[in-house]
Swiss-Prot record:
Upper classification of the organism: Eukaryota, Amoebozoa, Evosea, Eumycetozoa, Dictyostelia
Biased composition (Pro residues): 162-176
Any Pfam family: Pkinase
PROSITE patterns: PROTEIN_KINASE_DOM (PS50011), PROTEIN_KINASE_ST (PS00108)
Name of the protein in its database record: Probable serine/threonine-protein kinase DDB_G0291664
Length: 959
């Protein structure tokens, strides 16, 4: 079939092209216009022919007309051919209005019956008929001209007879005789000034418009004197209407969007013409399914922006017959054609849409779920109205499908009697409703493991997990709805979405049951942990509703609370509220609720193992609840004896190693004291909020890299507290963050101590004791004695370099910034030399040929990287902060009279510095410490030559 069609049209086009070439080579009129040639397009769905060769040796691109002839000249844009009629007569031997329909016939299904060798040219009888019609038209025109001349002569005679005082009355010239249809359809024309007339020649396929010399003037004429209605009445093609009115259309829409938007301006007389034009669109299947920015297809525009019109229904019926529209397409509001048709209330359009195969579904109405019960009741009545509406249409077979969809997405929550009364359901539908109200099932571990291909656990662990599983219920999916477009958070690698269950707002955590085997096992253990804390009743932990299977995914459903503690503390408005009501009262309240939550977990024998502010939720009533039990484990679990690498969050995680005991098992075992460290970091965050009024994160960055705050904690080390922090809280948090777990207090001791501090603090309404300076007290208590210093191996750093800045692009910085960076690093080296006089640890910066800036940490012991924790203070706090702290220490100790140096010592120290072997390292020290005067230089030399005493204060007065 296709080969026959192609051969047929190939022969026709070859004959046309050969004759066209001969005519264009002789005719000077065509050559003077510099026209390449005409592209004759045969518009059919299964093939598309065109010729783009140039007769004058030029190769030009051109835009083809979707409906007929169009030309592209090398000097102008796409224009209409000036001499279309002359061209068609010369080449084809017939007028253009008869030649083109024969080549572009709509009924392409009859092609197989035609002989490909027969040339489609008009017969002599047809030519005679055409000539007779032309002669009749010419005679009519001559008669009209004669009538006009007679009228003009009569007017002149009247002017001569009229008296001179009175002005002559000019009669209005009568228009030429027209058909009745033209007189009814043609609107009054107002010729614009300085505008060329455009001749329109009618044909069966439409009109051929002459070339537009001034497109701006011509477009203004169409805008002023015509509309879509007028264009259709004048038998313009669809593309001609689009070209004349495209200024009104957005660039994101195609021309079908535009035409269907204004289709209600046409009349019933144009239906046949419009139906033909729809069939002639070459790529209509692509255009009819294109979506604009709003996600609307042309049929969406047809239904949304038009009132009731016969043409609108004709278009939908025509598209249904062609079977080219995808009725599953929805706009950005997730509304399909049926939804818009129901909102419009047009019964006939709904019938046509349903016949076309549009699915019976409504858009998700998640906003209604967040409102009160009244909106839910209105939702029920809307379901009733739709059911009655479908019954009136005679589409009872669609009702079960509609109800099934609505049950899964609308989450109807109401009493069964009310549903029966409102919806007037029959016996079968009542059974369907009752099936929705089945009680929730409890989870079974064995069936769960079989479904997700998980091997049986150890005997004791399996029995323990099975007992916990029985306490978790599997929710009815018909009552659940999850909005995947709204992600409200994340828990580890899992995403948390917003949803509703029986009208209640919920938070749905996606379980990775389709991931790796370890992820599936962790999912089971998290569900078991949920069952383990079920006995707590939600007083200190977030309330878990159950497990929901939704769209072939498994979700852990929890009650949606206000926000997490991290977001709460980072919100300035919430901090202002706490300050108005007494910020210390709020801090003590939050601290005690966190401690009580930890005690409740210990009562059921559970370790959370990931305490941080992001895993505590603030309820709608202001209570602090524990959440995210993805890493939690039972204390009797065997696998729990080894310390997993992924336990906890970096900044809140307990140091992995400490000088607590020599037993490796005790060293690696995770116990209650391991979580005390995380609580200490959380309390430190709360203290910073109370003292500074802003949230301070424990996450400390060294340039672009993140340094683990907790790994480098040394014995008796305390990070800095804001000025004015109560000494009792400083001591408590310091004891909670000790590297040795055995020395940390228990959770009950901490709760009692917080209660005592709260009573003392609130009763005195002030701070007792000496005010602390930022970092000063920490440094005074920092122990540098060698007996307490031990080396700790850093994994995966064998013979490697620690790159703090991967690539420092000096081209993006000027020379001033580069010098500041170098001075900044030299100051850091200076501080490191003061802290580390023996040179065990080096912190260096250097420049290479490739202009890469590295920060090397060099200290080798037994082939691995070892660091003296007492000398590694530079990685705990940003180095510029250490420098500032050091300057403040010098000033403070000078005020206290603890620095015992004189001018002689200063001079001697300066001389020693000049003769030092490491003079290159201190090259810029005098520049960077010039603001300190002589104290900075006096403290550098002795510290670099003599061993370090017990306290850091002794570094600066070691005599």
């Amino acid at each position: 079939m296709e080969s026959k069609k192609n051969s047929y049209y190939k022969n026709v086009m070859d004959k046309i092209y050969a004759k066209e070439k001969d005519v264009l080579s002789i005719n000077k009129d065509f050559q003077e216009n510099n026209l390449t040639r005409i592209s004759l397009i045969l518009n059919y769905k299964d093939f598309y022919l065109k010729f783009d060769e140039s007769l004058h040796g030029y190769s030009f691109g051109y835009v083809t007309n979707l409906f007929g002839l169009k030309l592209y000249s090398p000097f102008t844009e796409t224009v209409r051919f000036d001499d279309t009629e002359k061209y068609m007569k010369t080449i084809l031997g017939v007028p253009s209005n008869e030649a083109l329909p024969q080549l572009c016939s709509d009924q392409h299904q009859n092609f197989e019956e035609k002989d490909p060798q027969i040339e489609i040219l008009p017969s002599p009888q047809q030519q005679q008929q055409q000539q007779q019609q032309q002669q009749q038209q010419q005679q009519q025109q001559q008669q009209q001209q004669q009538q006009q001349q007679q009228q003009q002569q009569q007017q002149q005679q009247q002017q001569q007879l009229t008296p001179p005082p009175s002005p002559p009355l000019l009669p209005i010239p009568q228009p030429p005789a027209q058909n009745e249809e033209q007189q009814l359809t043609q609107p009054p024309s107002i010729p614009p000034p300085q505008q060329k007339q455009i001749k329109i020649q009618k044909s069966d396929r439409g009109t051929q418009v002459k070339s537009i010399t001034n497109p701006v003037n011509s477009l203004s004429k169409y805008i002023n004197n015509s509309s879509l209605d007028y264009s259709i009445k004048k038998n313009y093609t669809l593309e001609e209407i689009y070209e004349n009115n495209k200024n009104y259309m957005d660039k994101t829409n195609n021309f079908l969007h535009f035409l269907f938007t204004f289709i209600d301006k046409t009349t019933i007389k144009d239906l046949e013409h419009f139906e033909k034009e729809i069939s002639r669109v070459h790529n209509i299947e692509k255009l009819i399914n294109e979506q604009n920015v709003k996600g609307e297809t042309p049929l969406h525009s047809l239904i949304l922006y038009n009132s009731e019109s016969c043409l609108k229904k004709l278009v939908i019926a025509k598209i249904n017959c062609m079977g080219i529209f995808d009725y599953s397409k929805c706009d950005n509001l997730n509304k399909n054609l049926l939804t818009h048709a129901i909102e419009k209330g047009d019964f006939e359009i709904i019938k046509l849409v349903l016949i076309g195969g549009c699915p019976l579904k409504m858009s998700p109405r998640s906003k209604l779920f967040k409102q009160n019960f009244k909106l839910y009741r209105q939702q029920i009545y809307r379901v009733f109205e739709i059911k009655e509406f479908l019954t009136e249409l005679g589409f009872n077979q669609f009702i079960p499908m509609f109800l099934e969809y609505e049950f899964k997405n609308i989450n109807i929550y109401y009493q069964i009697k009310s549903f029966i009364m409102v919806l007037t359901l029959n016996a079968d539908e009542i059974l369907r409703w009752k099936s929705l109200l089945e009680p929730n099932k409890n989870l079974d571990l064995d069936s769960f493991c079989i479904e997700y291909q998980i091997k049986d656990q150890n005997g004791s662990e399996s029995q323990l997990m099975a007992d916990h599983f029985k306490k978790v219920c599997q929710l009815n999916s018909l009552f659940g709805y999850i909005d995947f477009h709204t992600q409200i958070g994340s828990a580890g690698n899992a995403s948390v979405f917003e949803g509703t269950y029986k009208g209640m707002p919920i938070a749905c955590k996606e379980m990775p049951v389709s991931g790796t085997y370890e992820q599936r096992v962790d999912s089971i253990k998290e569900i078991a942990a949920v069952g383990q804390i079920e006995d707590l009743g939600g007083c200190t932990v977030v309330k878990t509703v159950g497990v929901l299977k939704y769209n072939e995914k498994l979700f852990l459903v929890m009650v949606k609370e206000k926000c997490n503690l991290l977001s709460f503390l980072s919100n300035k408005s919430e901090i202002l509220k706490m300050q108005r009501g007494g910020i210390w009262t709020s801090i003590f309240k939050i601290s005690k609720e966190i401690l009580k939550g930890l005690i409740s977990l210990r009562e059921v024998g559970m370790y959370h193992r990931d305490f941080k502010t992001a895993n505590f939720l603030v309820s709608n009533t202001g209570k602090i609840l524990i959440s995210d039990f993805g890493t939690s484990r039972d204390e009797n679990e065997k696998r729990f004896n080894t310390f997993a690498k992924t336990i906890g969050t970096l900044w809140y995680r307990c140091p992995r190693l400490g000088d607590c005991s020599g037993d490796e098992k005790t060293l690696n075992h995770y116990n209650e004291k391991s979580e005390i460290y995380s609580l200490g970091i959380i309390l430190w965050e709360l203290i910073c909020i109370a003292m500074t009024g802003t949230y301070v994160s424990p996450k400390i960055a060294l340039f672009q890299n993140e340094v683990d705050f907790s790994i480098w904690i040394h014995k008796d080390y305390r990070f800095s507290f804001p000025i004015g922090t109560p000494q009792s809280l400083v001591k408590l948090i310091t004891s909670m963050c000790l590297p040795c777990r055995d020395r940390r207090p228990t959770v009950h001791q901490i709760l009692d101590e917080v209660g005592i501090i709260e009573t003392e603090f609130l009763s005195n309404r002030g701070i007792k004791g000496e005010q602390t300076y930022s970092g000063l007290e920490c440094w005074r208590e920092f122990n540098f004695s060698k007996q307490n210093v031990f080396g700790i191996s850093i994994s995966n750093l064998h013979d490697t370099e620690y790159k703090a800045v991967n690539k420092y692009n000096y081209t993006s910085y000027n020379n001033k910034n580069s010098l500041l960076m170098k001075r900044y690093l030299d100051n850091s080296n200076f501080v490191v030399e003061l802290i580390n006089p023996n040179g065990i640890f080096k912190f260096k910066s250097f420049f290479e040929k490739e202009k890469l800036l590295y920060l090397k940490l060099k200290s080798t012991y037994k082939g691995e990287y070892y660091f003296d924790m007492g000398k590694f203070l530079t990685t705990i706090i940003q180095i510029h902060q250490i420098t500032e702290i050091y300057y403040k220490m010098l000033q403070k100790y000078r005020e206290l009279g603890l620095l015992r140096n004189n001018n002689n010592n200063i001079n001697n120290n300066n001389n020693n510095n000049n003769n030092c072997n490491n003079s290159k390292k201190f090259k810029t020290t005098s520049e960077s410490t010039s603001a300190l005067g002589s104290d900075a230089s006096s403290s550098s030399s002795p510290s670099s030559s003599s061993p370090s005493p017990k306290y850091s204060a002794s570094i600066y007065h070691h005599q």
